[in-house]
């Protein structure tokens, strides 16, 4: 299983003029008068051809009239997307707030930003942005207080190319940097000699999701890669036949040795981890669930040169639970796991037991429990348990905010880190020898601040804090609990300006995700301040399906119970209205990826409940999701369309298949990235086309295609400002909010 951290211009493809499109297709007879009063004339949607395609699922004939949109590079698809882009641009350009919003967002984002320092050898590295740079530079210093120099500047890259990650060699002399074309998940890894500033000839291609790992000598690399896709199939190709490879610096990657693969299980994906000693290559294997909460097998390969042709040792098989590799100490490998502990615990195993350490059912003596399961769930994000300075630093979640506790390696609890408040703590990375480490703390209205922790004493000191141009004290954050449809209490954060009146007239933006065991925790977004400044409320519902309360919370809303996620979100909206925070005409909703599915399902189930909706990179065709990219790996959460019982549940809520002609839908903007290889853009294309054809009311249905971006990764600062200005302008206009 892979965990991915993401930080949320060319012309549109195709050379077809709008006139040519109209000649070929005509103009749709579906017209929508502008609900916000922006346009003088009604919207005329470009025609999307409806064909008679039918699929047979377990004896049920299911229409798919926009199947042709899955051919992303076809002239017809390109022409339709171009016409949709022109329509959306013409609508957004007429919103008075758009220009002022861009100006305000530019000011809000214009402050110096620092990333957390990390070290390799004698060098320290950290990201830095002076304010409005397109992408942050990576700086390096000799020692923590040394003079900074640029290790790498993504701002010198060609247009459309963005940085996907960095890895420094253990001696700090070589920097591996990943490049993404247009924000795609596909990443090419290059290597730079930091002394000369020149790139080495080595390039690792067709990697996704995982960073490469260096051996302690800094000359050897292990990495995960896929076979090269056929030309034009980069966004459609399923994530199959992954393998771990070995690369020696200075050699051609075409001769790299395949270290581990399972051709009999083409859907398995592998993440390499190298122990600090270099003795063991630890491989976690997942059944295709990338970036999501899945179940792992764990294997270990002895890299001791005296052990020739060492076999791969199976430590855990059977995909029984989640296993996250934490580190190595004195011959023991440490893992965070959910086996027999839905809220998580820390265990250790000696791999020299040669496979006798498989943990089944009640557990085996070869596995030693270090930190038992507690009342709060361990954060499932990568790095939630770190082995640093002969201690384990464990991040847990209490009602969807961070707690951090430090343990000795024998499991003895030492202390709880005194965090600045209610928010999200991350980082805590380092080596077993480090005495001081860094962590990041962030809240909904407080940008990330960096703290320095003395691991032995437990004292924290502020190391760096940003200086934004707004006063965070004017805002209030509070948490409430509301009942869902079945009575389950769901936590929700509310953020708003102090002194706001709860009279049902406040424009409110409700956000949700609810899937794959991913916890939605407090995080900062400069653009959100512009919403709050104008009297808007921002609400975050911590829905079931996430990981906020551990694996049981996740499992309550998967496969046949996925409807509970939508029930939780709808109940949040109803509660906000009943408590006079807002009202239907003032209530906007947003979500992305699995959260985009959430928005699609909720607007098709309850179009009467919402005043406007933003659906980002959503999974909208739940009967075809497993046919593209990493979609097959989502079956654990969604179920399989090939399974009759799963099909019934999927068919019942699939947004694309539940758009009903003659329905008055609220204003909706469907947003996707043209390089999204994770959730293929066709999901959004088909959903938007179906909504436009079905719309019986006056509200606009728009499709916005983000250029040179993927599944949330890749946009420059100016692109972020543009996208946020468009989104908030759309909401402000359609929720009749005070505009700047």
Residue ranges and their predicted role:
Residues 1-12:
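N-terminal secretory signal peptides that target proteins for export/translocation
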Residues 15-26:
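Bacterial N-terminal signal peptides
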Residues 29-409, 413-422, 426-436, 442-448, ...:
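Beta-propeller folds
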Residues 129, 338, 442, 511-516, ...:
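Glycine-rich His-Gly loop
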Residues 155-166, 179-184, 198, 455-459, ...:
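Cap/lid segment of the alpha/beta-hydrolase catalytic domain
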Residues 269, 278, 293-298, 321-323, ...:
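Active-site lining segments that contact anionic ligands and/or coordinate catalytic metals
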Residues 335-339, 385-390, 394-399, 482-490, ...:
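C-terminal substrate/ligand-recognition segments
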Residues 527, 534, 540-740:
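Active-site-proximal cap/loop segments of hydrolase catalytic domains
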């Amino acid at each position: 299983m892979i965990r991915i951290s993401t930080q949320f211009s060319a012309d549109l493809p195709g050379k077809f003029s709008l006139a040519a499109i109209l000649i070929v297709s005509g103009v749709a007879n579906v017209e929508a008068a502008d609900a916000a009063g922006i346009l003088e004339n009604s919207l005329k949607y470009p025609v999307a051809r409806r064909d008679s395609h039918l699929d047979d699922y377990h004896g049920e004939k299911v229409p798919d009239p926009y199947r042709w949109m899955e051919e992303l590079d076809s002239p017809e698809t390109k022409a339709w997307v171009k016409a949709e882009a022109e329509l959306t641009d013409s609508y957004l350009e007429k919103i008075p707030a758009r220009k002022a919003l861009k100006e305000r967002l530019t000011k809000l984002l214009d402050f110096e930003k620092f990333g957390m320092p990390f070290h390799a050898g004698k060098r320290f590295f950290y990201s830095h942005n002076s304010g409005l740079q397109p992408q942050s530079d990576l700086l390096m210093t000799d020692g923590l207080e040394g003079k900074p120099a640029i290790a790498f500047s993504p701002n010198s890259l060609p247009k459309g190319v963005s940085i996907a990650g960095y890895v420094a060699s253990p001696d700090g002399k070589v920097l591996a940097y990943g490049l993404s074309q247009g924000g795609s998940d596909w990443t090419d890894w290059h290597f730079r000699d930091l002394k000369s500033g020149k790139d080495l000839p080595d390039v690792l291609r067709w990697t996704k999701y995982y960073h490469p790992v260096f051996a302690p000598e800094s000359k050897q690399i292990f990495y995960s890669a896929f076979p090269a896709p056929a030309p034009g199939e980069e966004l459609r190709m399923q994530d199959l036949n992954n393998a771990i490879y070995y690369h020696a610096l200075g050699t051609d990657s075409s001769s790299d040795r395949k270290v581990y693969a399972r051709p009999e299980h083409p859907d398995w994906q592998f993440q390499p981890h190298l122990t600090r000693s270099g003795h063991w290559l630890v491989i976690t294997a997942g059944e295709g669930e990338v970036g999501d909460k899945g179940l792992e097998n764990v294997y270990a390969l002895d890299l001791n040169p005296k052990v020739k042709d060492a076999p791969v040792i199976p430590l855990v098989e059977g995909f029984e639970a989640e296993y996250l590799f934490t580190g190595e100490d004195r011959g023991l490998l440490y893992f965070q796991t959910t086996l027999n502990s839905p809220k998580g615990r820390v265990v250790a195993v000696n791999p020299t037991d040669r496979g006798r350490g498989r943990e089944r059912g009640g557990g085996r003596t070869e596995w030693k429990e270090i930190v038992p399961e507690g009342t709060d769930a361990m954060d499932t994000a990568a790095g939630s348990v770190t082995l640093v300075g002969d201690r384990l630093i464990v991040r847990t979640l209490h009602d969807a905010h961070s707690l951090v506790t430090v343990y000795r390696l024998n499991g003895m609890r030492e202390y709880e880190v005194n965090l600045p408040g209610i928010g999200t703590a991350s980082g805590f990375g380092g080596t077993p020898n480090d005495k001081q480490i860094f962590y990041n703390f962030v809240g909904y209205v407080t940008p990330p601040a960096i703290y320095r922790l003395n691991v032995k004493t437990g004292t924290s000191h502020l190391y760096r804090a940003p200086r934004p141009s707004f006063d965070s004290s004017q805002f209030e954050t509070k948490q409430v609990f509301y009942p869902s449809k079945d009575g389950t209490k769901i936590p929700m954060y509310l953020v708003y300006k102090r002194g706001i009146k709860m009279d049902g007239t406040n424009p409110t933006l409700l956000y949700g995700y609810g899937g794959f065991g991913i916890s939605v925790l407090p995080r900062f977004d400069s653009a959100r301040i512009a919403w709050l400044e104008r009297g808007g409320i921002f609400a975050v519902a911590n829905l079931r399906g996430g990981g906020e309360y551990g694996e049981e919370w996740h499992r309550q809303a998967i496969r046949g119970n996925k409807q509970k996620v939508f029930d939780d979100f709808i109940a949040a909206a109803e509660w906000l209205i009943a408590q006079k925070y807002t009202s239907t005409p003032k209530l906007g909703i947003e979500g992305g990826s699995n959260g985009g599915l959430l928005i699609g399902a909720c607007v098709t189930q309850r179009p009467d409940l919402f005043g406007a909706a933003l659906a980002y990179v959503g999974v909208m065709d739940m009967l075809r999701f497993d046919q593209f990219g990493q979609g097959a790996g989502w079956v654990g959460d969604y179920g399989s369309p090939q399974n009759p019982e799963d099909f019934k549940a999927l068919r019942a809520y699939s947004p694309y298949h539940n758009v009903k002609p003659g329905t008055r839908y609220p204003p909706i903007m469907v947003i996707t990235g043209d390089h999204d290889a994770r959730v293929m853009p066709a999901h959004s294309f088909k959903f938007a086309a179906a909504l436009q054809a079905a719309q019986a009311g006056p509200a606009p249905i728009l499709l916005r295609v983000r250029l040179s971006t993927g599944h949330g990764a890749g946009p420059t600062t100016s692109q972020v400002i543009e996208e946020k200005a468009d989104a908030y302008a759309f909401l402000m206009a359609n929720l009749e909010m005070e505009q700047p």
